[in-house]
């Protein structure tokens, strides 16, 4: 746990001149674009400006229907109202978290929050985080959007606001968070990764370790304004397409084959010059038609996710730490855990349910072999194994084969 000296004091950091402005609005007006040349290379169509499709969250902010406020427990009435709204959303959207624990951290003055606020002071979502300025990272503690507001792009826009605000007001360049299996997809889309590049000496002992959660990291780029990243990527895409068009012949319209004059008939694709020049072959077509995953992939994925989210899965989410349990690998010669199973599943290494069950049983048998039957570890193994078989029995085609 972090020492008191490392905590952000409301009077020193949260209310510093750089962050006194508690309401932060994005400059989301589209910058003027330079007019593009009407003409182009001979025989090439003129370049067209592709309009940038703004998300509903951006349009609502531009119209003043929502705003993004950075708040902490500074004693003001408005801040208390916003923090209370955030607390209620977190408690509703994160039911596995103790309510008193959520309230304690949201109102903690060492934490800051950025909230999406509708008028008058109606909170629809937000992020609570704890900054560690001297260590140049922040821990995202809670992140949630109201369940009836999750289709407008609020989550992505909120994260972009947070990144730009933190970069502008502090030396922080990294975020760390613990995500459950349902939140990993969201954080991946926001630039987070399971690969932790920050040295453990920087963050170990400073952030809360959640059982069953996956630690993820996001490192910000200093020259990027994240609220404009969508428009920036569109410009890059247009530039790449312009380069391609300078050498491409894909815009040329070819006359249909003469064989089609009297109706459709079967022809050899390689007899068409344009197809032959493209380098296409029948093998490529056959390869493209092959399924990406095996027939059991999706059902196994659901089963694995259900097992990872089970309350008894906490001892099995990651490989046993050799430093914490030195003799474990002397006793257990074939170690297995749920994260390793997830990696194997992503690589299609479970062609049949039996292959999946074999590794799962390895987890339970290893646990019971190393631990006494009265330990919490062995009891968790029994509970999770029982749950797994219950789920398998709900899939008729599996229950016959297994």
From Swiss-Prot:
Cited SUPFAM superfamilies: Acyl-CoA N-acyltransferases (Nat), Bromodomain
GO CC, alphabetical: ADA complex; chromosome, centromeric region; cytosol; nucleus; SAGA complex; SLIK (SAGA-like) complex
Binding site for acetyl-CoA: 143-145, 150-156, 182-185
Null mutant phenotype: Leads to decreased N6-benzoyllysine levels and enzymatic activity of adhB. Decreases conidiation and seed colonization, increases sclerotia formation and aflatoxin production, and increases sensitivity to cell wall damage stress.
Bias type Basic and acidic residues, positions: 1-12, 26-37
E.C. no: 2.3.1.48, 2.3.1.-
CDD domains from the UniProt entry: Bromo_gcn5_like (cd05509), NAT_SF (cd04301)
Residue ranges of domain N-acetyltransferase in the record: 66-221
Major subcellular site: nucleus
GO biological processes: negative regulation of induction of conjugation with cellular fusion; positive regulation of transcription elongation by RNA polymerase II; transcription initiation-coupled chromatin remodeling
Region (Disordered) residue spans: 1-49
Subcellular location: Nucleus
Effect of residue 139 to H: Significantly decreases acetylation and benzoylation activities
Catalyzed reactions: L-lysyl-[protein] + acetyl-CoA = N(6)-acetyl-L-lysyl-[protein] + CoA + H(+); benzoyl-CoA + L-lysyl-[protein] = N(6)-benzoyl-L-lysyl-[protein] + CoA + H(+)
GO molecular function: histone crotonyltransferase activity; histone H3K14 acetyltransferase activity; histone H3K18 acetyltransferase activity; histone H3K9 acetyltransferase activity; histone reader activity; lysine-acetylated histone binding; transcription coregulator activity
Function as written in the Swiss-Prot or TrEMBL entry: Acts as an acetyltransferase that acetylates histones H2B, H3 and H4, and contributes to H2A.Z acetylation. Acetylation of histones gives a specific tag for epigenetic transcription activation. Also acts as a benzoyltransferase and benzoylates adhB at 'Lys-393' which activates adhB to affect the development, secondary metabolism, pathogenicity, and stress response.
Family per record: Belongs to the acetyltransferase family. GCN5 subfamily.
The protein's name: Histone acetyltransferase gcnE
Lineage of the organism: Eukaryota, Fungi, Dikarya, Ascomycota, Pezizomycotina
């Amino acid at each position: 746990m972090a020492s008191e000296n490392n905590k952000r004091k409301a009077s020193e950091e949260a209310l510093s001149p750089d962050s006194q402005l508690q309401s932060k609005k994005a400059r989301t007006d589209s910058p003027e674009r330079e007019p593009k040349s009407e003409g182009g290379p001979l025989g090439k169509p003129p370049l067209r400006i592709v309009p940038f499709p703004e998300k509903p969250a951006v349009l609502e902010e531009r119209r003043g229907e929502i705003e993004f406020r950075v708040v902490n427990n500074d004693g003001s009435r408005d801040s208390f109202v916003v923090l209370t709204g955030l607390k209620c959303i977190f408690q509703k959207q994160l039911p596995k978290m103790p309510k008193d624990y959520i309230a304690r951290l949201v109102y903690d003055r060492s934490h800051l929050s950025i909230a999406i606020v509708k008028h008058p002071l109606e909170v629809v979502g937000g992020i609570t985080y704890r900054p560690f300025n001297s260590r140049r990272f922040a821990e995202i503690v809670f992140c949630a959007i109201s369940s009836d507001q999750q289709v407008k792009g609020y989550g992505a826009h909120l994260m972009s606001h947070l990144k730009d605000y933190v970069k502008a007001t502090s030396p922080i360049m990294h975020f760390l968070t613990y995500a459950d299996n349902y939140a990993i997809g969201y954080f991946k889309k926001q630039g987070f990764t399971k690969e932790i590049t920050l040295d453990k000496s920087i963050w170990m002992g400073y952030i809360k370790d959640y059982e069953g959660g996956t630690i993820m990291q996001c490192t910000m780029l200093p020259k990027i304004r994240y609220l404009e990243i969508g428009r920036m990527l569109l410009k890059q895409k247009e530039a790449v397409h312009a380069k391609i068009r300078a050498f491409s012949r894909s815009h040329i319209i070819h006359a249909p084959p003469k064989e089609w004059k009297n109706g459709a008939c079967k022809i050899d694709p390689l007899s068409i010059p344009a197809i032959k020049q493209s380098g296409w072959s029948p093998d490529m077509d056959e390869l493209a038609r092959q399924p990406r995953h095996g027939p059991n992939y999706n059902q196994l994925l659901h089963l694995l996710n259900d097992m990872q989210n089970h309350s008894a899965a906490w001892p099995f989410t990651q490989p046993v730490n050799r430093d914490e349990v030195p003799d474990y690998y002397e006793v257990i010669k074939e170690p297995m855990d749920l994260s390793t199973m997830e990696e194997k599943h992503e690589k299609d290494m479970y062609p049949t349910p039996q292959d999946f069950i074999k590794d799962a049983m390895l987890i339970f048998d290893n646990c019971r072999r190393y631990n006494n039957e009265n330990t919490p570890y062995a009891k968790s193994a029994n509970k999770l194994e029982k749950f797994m078989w219950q789920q398998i029995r709900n899939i008729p085609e599996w229950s016959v084969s297994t």
